């Protein structure tokens, strides 16, 4: 915990090569970022850790994904099925209810990814990732760091937007997009090619890797 600030939280799984080092790094790195941040002073009050260790490998890969509904349309409630396979070959099916937004474009992509893979995709600049511009944003970003034991689901559409003052503004009307891109007095503006129309997470018991993408052509009827 930090004095007069939101506490940092940790909940993750590390497995494979040097998991102890990875776990220690995951704790020390965000604390170091905050202590050495350039936005303002911050004081560490306390640190509480609960560690569970095991001799067994605990990893899984994303094998396949599909939707229960064959004809997909805007404003539809459906269920996403995600199959993961452990290093021992055991498959597990995860179910995630989700809703296709009413304003979704004719073609959307459904991305299911591990935290590592999602971070790499965001670094390519096609999906907006928040860039901290102050201490509160930095703490929020660190608490939202992608974890190994999560399945991250993103519904993506070709709605251009901008990254403004560290915050993604997606699915902007053409007129608003032109204003943001022309008005440099607001600070650095970066164009985004895709908008996240929906975001979900699924907890797992393993450290997950891999990603799958479904391209969906929405039925207008």
Task: Give the role of each language-model region.
Residues 1-221:
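Long, low-hydrophobicity ectodomains and other hydrophilic envelope-associated domains
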């Amino acid at each position: 915990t930090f004095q007069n600030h939101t506490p940092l939280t940790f909940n993750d799984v590390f497995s494979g090569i040097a998991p102890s080092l990875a776990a220690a790094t995951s704790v020390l790195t965000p604390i170091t970022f905050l202590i050495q941040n350039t936005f303002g002073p911050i004081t560490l009050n306390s640190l509480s850790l609960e560690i569970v260790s095991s001799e067994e490998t605990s990893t899984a890969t994303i094998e396949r994904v599909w939707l229960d509904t064959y004809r997909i349309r805007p404003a539809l409630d459906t269920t996403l099925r995600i199959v993961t396979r452990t290093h021992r070959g055991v498959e597990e099916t995860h179910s995630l209810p989700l809703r296709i937004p009413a304003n979704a474009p004719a073609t959307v992509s459904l991305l299911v990814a591990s935290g590592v893979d999602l971070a790499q995709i965001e670094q390519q600049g096609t999906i907006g990732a928040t860039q901290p511009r102050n201490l509160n944003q930095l703490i929020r970003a660190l608490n939202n760091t992608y974890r190994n034991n999560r399945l991250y689901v993103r519904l993506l559409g070709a709605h251009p937007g901008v990254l403004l003052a560290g915050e993604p503004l997606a699915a902007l009307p053409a007129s608003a997009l032109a204003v943001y891109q022309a008005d440099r007095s607001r600070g650095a503006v970066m164009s985004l090619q895709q908008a996240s129309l929906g975001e979900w997470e699924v907890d797992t018991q393993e450290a997950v890797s891999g990603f799958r993408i479904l391209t969906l052509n929405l039925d207008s009827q």
